[in-house]
């Protein structure tokens, strides 16, 4: 299992998804990640030392199933609060959002082969509410397969047998979808489209000086609706989400900088930031270190 003391470095190691991540509070400054290919399926197990506001897209050829581990209720996927039977189903090419506010948490995922009919390319992601017993069987099997080095997958027969067990349990989860008990806010397709438009705009110009009114206009909604959508999707206001994205953009630049040639002031200036003291205070509150600490530690 890979261990990281930096959230962004951990995020860059996550496989099979194009992610925009923002750390939301740290309980324990440690993030861990493990992967395992089992025949035609790809397993992933993640432990995060704090909260995470995530928007991403599935890069696998087949459907990706994401499931929270531990006690439910703290994880929100596609604006729906997760329970013991929640499975986030992400077809190939589909995007999704996940929020966990200000707490350490864990999750696992399984990428199915493209031949498994679990979601067509271009279809939207959605939260499936399956039998909790089947979901527990699947998460336990994934956790054991990834965490147990004694499982020898070099043997084709062992790998094939485990792959078939994983696919059988995953198929059992997909076969039953019960009505969700908790739905936050407005219809999820509309909300996801609003989130998608804002994230796309921020991807194009993460350090731009757009106002919240500008972003609402870009998404085709009112300021009030934009606020409700971001509260449902990420648990924060649009302004706070934009601030977090800006902080992480600068952090990545500092991590990739050369302390022999760069200074914090130059990096910030390249990102249109001139109020160095104010920004440094926000940066320290978010990451627990100063911008110069990041530049010199990563250099």
State what each model feature region is.
Residues 47-52, 69-71, 91-94:
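Short acidic (Asp/Glu) patches
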Residues 1-61:
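N-terminal low-complexity or simple alpha-helical regulatory segments
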Residues 226, 230, 278-279, 283:
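Short hydrophobic/aromatic patch on the recognition helix
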Residues 232-233, 285-286, 297:
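Alpha-helical DNA-recognition elements
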Residues 240:
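Short, basic-rich loop-to-helix N-cap that marks the start of a DNA-contacting helix
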Residues 1-26, 64, 73-206, 211-213, ...:
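Alpha-helical bundle regulatory/interaction domains
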Residues 57-73:
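Short, conserved beta-strand element in jelly-roll/cupin
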Residues 244-249:
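Alpha-helical structural segments
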């Amino acid at each position: 299992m890979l261990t990281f003391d930096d959230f962004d470095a951990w995020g860059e190691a996550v496989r099979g998804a194009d992610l925009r991540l923002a750390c939301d509070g740290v309980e324990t400054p440690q993030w861990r990640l493990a992967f395992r290919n089992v025949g035609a399926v790809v397993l992933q197990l993640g432990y995060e030392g704090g909260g995470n506001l995530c928007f991403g897209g599935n890069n696998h050829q087949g459907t990706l199933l994401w499931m929270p581990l531990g006690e439910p209720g703290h994880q929100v996927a596609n604006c729906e609060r997760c329970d013991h039977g929640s499975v986030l189903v992400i077809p190939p090419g589909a995007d999704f959002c996940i929020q966990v506010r200000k707490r350490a948490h864990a999750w696992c995922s399984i990428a199915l082969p493209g031949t498994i009919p679990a979601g067509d390319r271009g279809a939207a992601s959605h939260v499936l509410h399956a039998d909790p017993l089947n979901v527990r069987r699947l998460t336990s099997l994934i956790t054991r397969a990834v965490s147990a080095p004694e499982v020898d997958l070099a043997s084709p027969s062992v790998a094939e047998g485990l792959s078939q067990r994983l696919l059988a349990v995953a198929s059992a989860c997909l076969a039953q979808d019960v009505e969700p008990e908790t739905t936050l806010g407005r219809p999820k397709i509309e909300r996801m489209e609003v989130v998608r438009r804002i994230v796309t705009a921020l991807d194009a110009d993460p350090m731009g000086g757009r106002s919240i009114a500008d972003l609402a206009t870009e998404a085709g909604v009112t300021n009030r609706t934009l606020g409700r959508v971001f509260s449902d999707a990420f648990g924060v206001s649009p302004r706070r989400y934009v601030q977090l994205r800006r902080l992480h953009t600068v952090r990545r630049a500092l991590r990739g900088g050369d302390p022999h040639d760069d200074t914090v002031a130059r990096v910030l200036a390249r990102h249109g930031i001139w109020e160095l003291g104010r920004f440094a205070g926000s940066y320290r509150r978010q990451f627990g270190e100063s911008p110069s600490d990041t530049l010199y530690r990563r250099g």
